[in-house]
Amino acid sequence: MILSLLLVSCSTSSDTEVPASTAQPETTDPADAISWESCGDGLECGYLDVPIDYTDENSATTSLYLTKHMATSSSQRIGTLLVNPGGPGFGGSFLAESAANIYSPTLLKSFDIVAWDPRGTGQSIPAIDCTDDYDYFFAGGDITPDTDQERAEGIATYKEFTDLCFEKNGDLLPYVGTNNSARDMDMIRRALGEDKISYFGFSYGSELGATWATLFPDTVRAADLDGASDP
């Protein structure tokens, strides 16, 4: 109920101070930016291509997987609510797929619920995959080392895992992080044809949301950051 009241009633002030490092929001023609297809139970699914490296105008692209649960009332629709479950390291598209079981009727009437698998995760392309045997690295590891030898063994194992990740995903890994994910969020907004969107993120999703709001304050209608990270 609190989330519904916050997002339905709140809007951001138009005189928000813009930090010097703030990225400039843009609008785009939404046509064909996301190729939505029906994926059952009133859901739409699609992909959006975004630059891997936002500093390179000739960058290759990565494809973000998105899901959308349409607002149940066209007359009461406010706009888009972008949602992220935190982590990081796993997809978030399930937050729209399970919208009917997660959000209040008020939110479902008022917003298109849009979720996505952040770059490198879930059904986004490419997805980071480091090994065929994750149990080898994590199931038998000692997460509470008591001796220097145990600590050294743990460090060696994690280094082996990290080296494998870079060997298999080196073209993408340097560009998987909070700032680029926040820029991806603005690309999603642009592709949806929205001037402003609302956001709900919890756990690490609060840090992602705060970064997005700092970079693109003029595009924030409202934001709910649940379980916020310690600044």
PLM regions: where:
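Sec-dependent N-terminal signal peptides
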Residues: 1-3, 17
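C-terminal motif of bacterial Sec signal peptides marking the signal peptidase cleavage site
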Residues: 6-9
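Bacterial signal peptide processing site
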Residues: 11-14
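Beta-sheet-rich non-transmembrane sensory/scaffold domains
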Residues: 17-23
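Gly/Pro-rich cap/lid or specificity-loop segments adjacent to the active site
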Residues: 23-231
